[in-house]
UniProtKB/Swiss-Prot annotation:
It comes from the Eukaryota. One of its GO terms (biological process) is termination of RNA polymerase III transcription. One of its GO terms (molecular function) is DNA-directed RNA polymerase activity. GO terms for cellular component: RNA polymerase III complex. It is found in: Nucleus. Keywords: DNA-directed RNA polymerase, Nucleus, Transcription, Zinc. InterPro entries: POLR3C_WHD, RNA_pol_III_RPC82-rel_HTH, RNA_pol_III_Rpc82_C, RPC3, WH-like_DNA-bd_sf. This is DNA-directed RNA polymerase III subunit RPC3. Signal peptide: none annotated. Belongs to the RNA polymerase beta chain family. It comes from Lodderomyces elongisporus (strain ATCC 11503 / CBS 2605 / JCM 1781 / NBRC 1676 / NRRL YB-4239).
Length: 610
């Protein structure tokens, strides 16, 4: 594609820019044009797409089939004309392609190569029928080997499903949640009769409440069908007729676990963060999703305060259902066995004994004369004390039981609950803890946002920002008095913050005619808008990195095509010139460096989309 096309896509929106490049990389130029057009126009049918893109209907149909199969498009049948289907963008499939490398890397490290192979096949095909996948192990093997290999694969599928990494694909997954909601709402409203004693506002509210219950029941029914499991020869396994797809929400929960663990590591320490990671893993599968169907329906929940209250209510429900509640024994199951945690928490008794020994070194070697005339060292003598401490240490090391380990882990949990200003866990009852995901997600965003401001705009801008957040609405003079800086310095730092879209100006008129001479300006900070602005910047940077990789690959297309030839692949040292080898190594290094930048930027994107 020419540069004019990318300039137009770049100007449309950062998300369109990234998704267009992702679709082009995996599915080709036609798919990229379709994604760009649908993001710009909302939803269209095939004829409308052809008119806007000037593409042939045949090529559009073939690209749409691939996009739907990879969960990159929704479709919806027209109620008035059943032969017409409308298509819109499904971000789930595009995000899965963006995360695909990290997904496979995590599955390989956490489970193994066989599990990663299954996940890779599911991502490549979008979804697959379980029986079709297992049928490949029924061909050229002996009966016993064939049965055992198929049984092992069935166990892997069952494990991945129970852990939440794969889910059942239903017909509703191909429809946008807003289309399902509107259909349910229209049917519910039609069946809700009008009454002279009931206002129209109350009637709409009642219909909306009933529709919410119907929607949640419908989604829950598709998650847990009646024919989910079958029992064969005493083994419980998944029904081979099920169609499975990858569950992106599960990987997003894992990314949240990593981010919260790193936050605990920076605030408290390494060993405590390992304890916290084990606690997060114990409730990871049952933890709240990063998004909810009600939040994806336009107009249902709009106000950021209402969104926060809704997420708090979901978290309260999960806590009441014990889905995000854990104990020390739950942490023990996920805690690394080889990690030595002895003496990792300093108690008051250990502090006191250490201070008593080292408080006065002169008196520790003082000698007194006994009745029999012999001298006695009041410090106990070096040899006697060391021998006693050595014996105690050997005894403690030899009998460090699971109860001792659980006791130390519980001390770390109490440190997470009340050791810092950030409360990482709540002790809801003696020995039972819950994790406040909503509050911690906000803390995580604030921590990284302030770190970015401090690293890019330096310390003085960071101080000014903290002051503005504390004062909520402030002028330059009040900021200067609070942060102990000159007004000129504050003015420069505020300008840099405004330029970086960190804070915004609010005009305060002093007269009715809003005369400029009688107007003064205050500075304020709005958290929600700042995070949204930063997300757009991160997405744009990710797209620019992908575009950069494509550019230098196109510049060296002849060399790369030569390296991909069958006779050259694997024999590059013999078939390529020295200059070509040098260029090839340079391209590989550039690609690795750009991928590292992409992953770092994407990790920040993960944090601010929690």
């Amino acid at each position: 594609m020419d540069e004019d096309y990318y300039s137009a896509v770049r100007a449309q929106s950062p998300k369109t820019y990234l998704y267009a490049l992702t679709a082009e990389t995996h599915l080709g130029e036609v798919a990229s044009v379709i994604i760009t057009t649908l993001l710009a126009s909302g939803r269209l049918n095939i004829k409308q797409i052809s008119v806007k893109t000037k593409l042939a209907i045949k090529s559009i149909k073939s690209a749409i089939v691939s996009l739907i199969q990879l969960n990159c498009l929704y479709y919806w049948q027209d109620d008035k004309n059943p032969t017409i289907f409308y298509y819109s963008v499904n971000e789930t499939g595009l995000k899965t392609l963006v995360y695909s490398g990290d997904i496979l890397n995590h599955i390989t490290q956490e489970y193994g190569d066989e599990e990663a192979e299954i996940i890779q096949n599911i991502i490549m095909n979008g979804h697959l029928k379980l029986d079709d996948y297992l049928r490949q192990y029924d061909n050229d093997l002996e009966k016993s080997d064939e049965a055992s290999l198929r049984l092992e694969k069935e166990k892997i599928f069952l494990k991945l499903y129970n852990e939440g990494w794969i889910k059942i694909l239903s017909l509703n997954d191909f429809h946008h949640i807003n289309d399902i909601w509107e259909k349910l709402f229209d049917d519910t409203l039609r069946n809700t009769p009008r009454s002279s004693t009931t206002s129209e506002v109350k009637r709409l509210a009642e219909a909306q409440s009933v529709c919410k219950e119907k929607l949640m029941a419908l989604l829950e029914k598709t998650k847990q069908p009646l024919d989910l499991y079958i029992t064969e020869n005493g083994y419980k396994k998944l029904n081979p007729n099920l169609v499975l797809t990858f569950n992106l929400t599960r990987f997003q929960k894992r990314s949240r676990t990593v981010a919260l663990t790193n936050l605990a590591k920076s605030r408290i320490g390494l060993i405590t963060s390992k304890v916290y990671e084990a606690a997060l893993k114990s409730v990871e599968n049952g933890s709240p999703d990063l998004s909810h169907p009600f939040l994806e329906i336009p107009g249902l929940i709009n106000n950021p305060t209402d969104v926060k209250d809704f997420k708090d209510s979901l978290e309260t429900t999960l806590t009441a259902e014990k889905k995000i509640v854990f104990t020390v024994k739950d942490v023990m199951r996920y805690f690394p066995k080889l990690l030595d945690i002895k003496n990792s928490v300093i108690t008051e008794n250990s502090k006191r004994s250490f201070n008593d020994i080292n408080a006065n070194p002169e008196t520790s070697n003082k000698k007194i004369k006994l009745e029999n005339g012999n001298a006695f060292n009041t410090g106990g003598g070096a040899s006697g004390a060391n021998t006693s401490n050595s014996n105690n240490h050997l005894t403690a090391s030899s009998f460090f039981t699971d109860e001792d380990r659980m006791s130390i882990i519980e001390q770390h949990l109490r440190l997470l609950a009340a050791g810092t200003n950030t409360q990482f866990v709540h002790e809801i009852s003696p020995g039972r803890y819950a994790i406040p995901f909503v509050k911690l997600s906000n803390e995580l965003k604030q921590f990284h946002y302030e770190s970015l401001v401090k690293s890019t705009l330096q310390d003085q801008a960071f101080r000014v920002l903290r002051c503005i957040k504390h004062l909520k609405l402030a002028d330059e003079k009040s900021i200067a008095n609070a942060v102990l800086l000159k007004e000129k310095t504050v003015r420069n730092e505020v300008y840099q913050l405004i330029k970086a879209n960190v804070v915004e100006i609010q005009e305060i008129p002093r007269s009715v005619d809003r005369a400029a001479s009688k107007t003064f300006y205050l500075v304020k900070y709005k958290e929600y808008h700042r995070f949204e602005s930063l997300i757009n910047c991160l997405v744009y940077n990710m797209a620019e990195i992908v575009r950069n990789i494509q550019n230098f690959k196109m510049e060296n297309k002849i060399l790369l095509d030569k390296c991909n030839r069958v006779d050259v692949e694997g024999n590059e040292d013999e078939m390529l010139l020295d200059s070509e080898l040098k260029t090839l190594h340079g391209l590989q290094n550039r690609e690795v460096m750009n991928l590292v930048r992409f992953n770092r930027t994407r990790s920040l994107w993960d944090i601010f989309t929690l």
